[in-house]
């Protein structure tokens, strides 16, 4: 079993093209089902999830292929998961 802290320590990598998205900064949880729906990773150019562009990667849980000791492997198209931050 993993905790949020554990996920934040893992780098997210796309198996399609080897892109390194960064580290998990947040989760979207479906409260009705009690399941994680989406992993959120700060977009390109962001430092510590704070400074930089106002974009983020929103990776649906269904796109996660493997959670390893140090990394999270995902299989998705970058242009479909890189979105404007709505905060």
Predicted regions: what is each one?
Residues 1-87:
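Peripheral interaction segments used for macromolecular assembly
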